[in-house]
């Protein structure tokens, strides 16, 4: 009778152990290692308890591996999608490049069609004729362009021998000098010293036609009136 009471009192331990074992086999068991150990340590044999603990540990590992496997699958799916997108992008770019390369030859053929490898001499002569006409037109235009004449403005100081020199006669002699490109300008008498005056006269000369040295020599040739000739000012116009 005492033994029956013991079995009845301990019956729930066996039922709890059996339920835990069945849940483990079905994969629905959520282990509580501390509670299970405390509950079953006094009921099940040590070997059975060790086997149950091993099964629980294995179930935990399987569940962890399953979770890791799901995460890994998500990563793989993402990488596959990325690779697929890159592949499509590369194929699109390669298609455009290939299309451009294939489209280039016709343009080259059109250019080749414009080139006459067997052109006649008449075309060459025509080109030379056009070139010659253009050169002639340019030369004619250039020849009609007004040429800039370089000129200089000169101020001369002409000194007499003394105060008795006829300055009016000296000026007339100087102005009598005529040269192509020489134009006489204004003049005046400028006191020098001791009653002596010098003739200061201006003129404009074309540089290409009149030599200043030659002009001075012509003035100095009037020895009866002229002692010396100096260039007081010389300016390019």
UniProtKB/Swiss-Prot annotation:
<dbReference type="GO" id="GO:0003746">
    <property type="term" value="F:translation elongation factor activity"/>
</dbReference>
<dbReference type="InterPro" id="IPR014038">
    <property type="entry name" value="EF1B_bsu/dsu_GNE"/>
</dbReference>
<dbReference type="GO" id="GO:0005829">
    <property type="term" value="C:cytosol"/>
</dbReference>
<dbReference type="GO" id="GO:0005853">
    <property type="term" value="C:eukaryotic translation elongation factor 1 complex"/>
</dbReference>
<keyword id="KW-0251">Elongation factor</keyword>
<dbReference type="InterPro" id="IPR001326">
    <property type="entry name" value="Transl_elong_EF1B_B/D_CS"/>
</dbReference>
<dbReference type="Pfam" id="PF00736">
    <property type="entry name" value="EF1_GNE"/>
</dbReference>
<dbReference type="InterPro" id="IPR049720">
    <property type="entry name" value="EF1B_bsu/dsu"/>
</dbReference>
<protein>
    <recommendedName>
        <fullName>Elongation factor 1-delta</fullName>
    </recommendedName>
</protein>
<dbReference type="InterPro" id="IPR018940">
    <property type="entry name" value="EF-1_beta_acid_region_euk"/>
</dbReference>
<feature type="region of interest" description="Disordered">
    <location>
        <begin position="97"/>
        <end position="120"/>
    </location>
</feature>
<dbReference type="Pfam" id="PF10587">
    <property type="entry name" value="EF-1_beta_acid"/>
</dbReference>
<comment type="similarity">
    <text>Belongs to the EF-1-beta/EF-1-delta family.</text>
</comment>
<dbReference type="InterPro" id="IPR036219">
    <property type="entry name" value="eEF-1beta-like_sf"/>
</dbReference>
<dbReference type="InterPro" id="IPR014717">
    <property type="entry name" value="Transl_elong_EF1B/ribsomal_bS6"/>
</dbReference>
<dbReference type="GO" id="GO:0005085">
    <property type="term" value="F:guanyl-nucleotide exchange factor activity"/>
</dbReference>
<keyword id="KW-0648">Protein biosynthesis</keyword>
<comment type="subunit">
    <text>EF-1 is composed of 4 subunits: alpha, beta, delta, and gamma.</text>
</comment>
<comment type="function">
    <text>EF-1-beta and EF-1-delta stimulate the exchange of GDP bound to EF-1-alpha to GTP.</text>
</comment>
<feature type="compositionally biased region" description="Acidic residues">
    <location>
        <begin position="109"/>
        <end position="120"/>
    </location>
</feature>
